[in-house]
Amino acid sequence: MRTFVHGGGRLPEGIDAALAHYRHQVFVGRLGWQLPMADGTFERDQYDRDDTVYVVARDEGGTICGCARLLPTTRPYLLKDVFASLLMHGMPPPESPEVWELSRFAARSGAPCPRSGRADWAVRPMLASVVQCAAQRGARRLIGATFVSMVRLFRRIGVRAHRAGPVRCIGGRPVVACWIDIDASTCAALGIPSASAAPGPVLQ
């Protein structure tokens, strides 16, 4: 698995369609999400815009095998606009250059899995690139809506992940707003020596 960062809402020719197709496969096809702007092949929404930062993973053959979307909370973002009910009662959605939203996160390994078959085999390197990318843009925390099972997985990896509100059932699965602290503990767990100084993933 190799990760690539694409900033400013810019995706190279061919990657835009491939990423939208991969997101449709994962979030609509596999997870069964009812997304209003998804058609029969592609998944995009109003948060794919000029300030969106994408982290895209590709396997040895160049096929997309992971994705993530980062948005600054100083502009409209998914959790604030759609899932604010997931936040703790009375907690305003964050609006800070030091907090970025993580959404559309998915990963599968581009290499054979170890015998253990552990899910973090693919998630850990993908999340490492996401955290590194966000930190290089001034983020100290990430926030986003995710499955409770994903929060447990982040914690098992060693990431400082914790709930930002109550668990709610959405689409038949428990979902929660989740903080990820970009601190020394998280960086060490992800193999990032320093969140601000570590070499970043390939930029395009």
Curated annotation (Swiss-Prot):
Its EC number is 2.3.1.184. It catalyses: a fatty acyl-[ACP] + S-adenosyl-L-methionine = an N-acyl-L-homoserine lactone + S-methyl-5'-thioadenosine + holo-[ACP] + H(+). Keywords: Autoinducer synthesis, Quorum sensing, S-adenosyl-L-methionine, Transferase. InterPro entries: Acyl_CoA_acyltransferase (IPR016181), Autoind_synth_CS (IPR018311), Autoind_synthase (IPR001690). It holds the Pfam family Autoind_synth. GO terms for molecular function: N-acyl homoserine lactone synthase activity. Signal peptide: none annotated. One of its GO terms (biological process) is signal transduction. Required for the synthesis of acyl-HSL autoinducers that bind to SolR. Belongs to the autoinducer synthase family. This is Acyl-homoserine-lactone synthase. It comes from Ralstonia solanacearum.
